[in-house]
Amino acid sequence: MSRRAHPERRCPGCRLHLALCLCGDVAPIDTVHRLCLVIHAAEANKTTNSGLLAARSLRHCDVKTIGHTRPEQDDDVAGALGLAVTTRCVLLFPADDARPLADVVAEASGPITLVVPDGTWAQTQKMRRRVPGLQALPCVSLPAGPPTAYHLRAEPKEGGLSTLEAIARAFCVLEGPQAGPVVEEGLLSIFARFVERTLWMRGQLADRDLVYGLPDAARRVSPRGGVAAPGSSVG
């Protein structure tokens, strides 16, 4: 049974129920390379979005929102990419001509800005075609790796990853053999907590199956949709 007593009372940072907020666990990670997250406005409002969590977890990151009903509200993506003149910009997108990210890193003589579109498959395809500045960027692909641990949505494509998982794998390549795995693990660790707390709030994960535990405040959330009395069980 769902534990979502007050679904509107969510942290504006991590989007979790206030009692489950994990913002205090997010310590921005320093990286040599930079992330530019281009997120669709509809995706930015979803509580299961992982791209914004990745952005909060990386110190060197820009977030640009597009796809508003009024185009004048969209952020200037092309302008942001133009400001990144000191870095090479590449687009993480599975185009037919996408090159392995590792090859691009091997050729680079300085920092890279990884541009990541965030939305549904249809939205990201449209973003690439229509957002000024994106279509001209060379596309890069990720190496093979473990299957997704994102159990909050159905993946439309076999082998698909959440946005955060894709960013984590990309930065494992970007940051090199020593720092890369550390960055990847830092991102995936906060992601695992996010997924676990969301599943618990939905009533899809029992207390006994929790790996990372819950904040004390969460123990007062009743599985019947209210606030439990002190000492009540929530399992």
Give each language-model segment a name:
Residues C11-C14:
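Short cysteine-rich clusters marking metal-coordination/redox-active sites
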Residues L18-C21, D25:
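Cys/His-rich microdomains that often coordinate metals
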Residues R34-A41, R88-F93:
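Short hydrophobic beta-strand segments
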Residues T113, W121-G235:
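C-terminal folded domains that constitute the principal catalytic or ligand-binding module
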Residues K46-S57:
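Histidine-anchored nucleotide/phosphate-binding helix
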Residues R59-R129, G133:
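S-adenosyl-L-methionine/SAH cofactor-binding core of RNA-modifying enzymes
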Residues M1-A5:
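Short, flexible, mixed-charge glycine/proline-rich loop motifs
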Residues P7, H17, T31:
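Short metal-coordination and nucleic-acid-contact micro-motifs, chiefly zinc-binding Cys/His arrays
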